[in-house]
């Protein structure tokens, strides 16, 4: 049964200026209707329009009148018009600067309207002062004191001072150390120009030590441009850069999950990606560790857990199961690597049995990966990080007895090409990582479905290049042994080149 409130909305008496007037307490306007009417007369604004959104209307009018060439002419001299009480300090401000901040403008207009007796006279004085450029000395306007309470711990006095300084100057330098505080200050002040400037600064300063805080700031303020940039940057740098530093510990789990699911993710191999993710888990469980351990130390740690069940089926490992479901364990084909995975008792036995069975069937059928259908989500991934000092760079990979060389070539200062080529096992110098315990296929041809992609950062924007998905038979004799080449023109460096392929049934 619905209860009805029989109590009618009462009007309350409030003294505004020298009069005694009625108003509804639920009214959206912070003063009263007569005061609003007075302001509309001064500003030459239609009262009906003002009633729809009085705060926004008044602020926009003042902004239009006050934000002129003062921003380009340096700081303003003269006596302050407004005293801002905030963070235990009293900050002296001027009208043209106040109206760049919606928060300060609302506080100021509220205080001005509620000030005793002279709301209309003060408005007329302010408008008169700023309407004539020839006027060198302003008429005295009574100083208004406004207060702003800030509870955000990110806003320090130094950061807030920098934010207020940006009201007066276009070029105020921000560092990585204070940009988050200035961003928080700009958000509270509703100072859009400064907020965009902070975001731009953060976009250009993504590093292993800033990625966490910048991403969380993007989430906090719902700034999609910043969160997307963090995701793209980490997708490229998780394995080659962040995974080699202690900052890996601070990557938030939601961000890590998004990156692992990203089709743009760069990795040297599936096993490199697995090692990076294992290291992240190790660092979550060993908070006092200040440097990355060697690989053997990490393996010994996971091997020390009870053998009654695997790590991912125990606490806290179970909570990280979604992360490891993103991996393509079928892309790890080295017997040594698979034995290592089995030894640490990290994954459910059913996962390892399925991977081993798929490898067995692929070897038995000459390399056919009948269990893989979708190149974009199931392909085996390999990568080259082409650095500035390289003119040619290549790596050799072995899968089910087939050997391929993935290669990048620099043709001139801005021209590059990336390709893959099938090679004979007899052409190898047999580095242990490729030849040791490898099977050798005697098949003269191998059907391969592949795609080559390259990405690089230029002026804060990612350039992306790629071939289509290509189906090709690889033999040993040119030109049949070589893939299509991905040719690109870019000034970006380094270049992240990714090779994805599967062996369809043939």
Curated annotation (Swiss-Prot):
InterPro entries, A to Z: BTB_BTBDG, BTBD16, BTBD16_C, SKP1/BTB/POZ_sf
Residue ranges of every copy of the BTB domain listed in the record: 150-206
CDD domains in UniProt: BACK_BTBD16 (cd18492)
Signal peptide: none
Pfam family, one: BTB_BTBDG
PANTHER family in the cross-refs: BTB/POZ DOMAIN-CONTAINING PROTEIN 16, BTB_POZ DOMAIN-CONTAINING PROTEIN 16
Name this polypeptide is given: BTB/POZ domain-containing protein 16
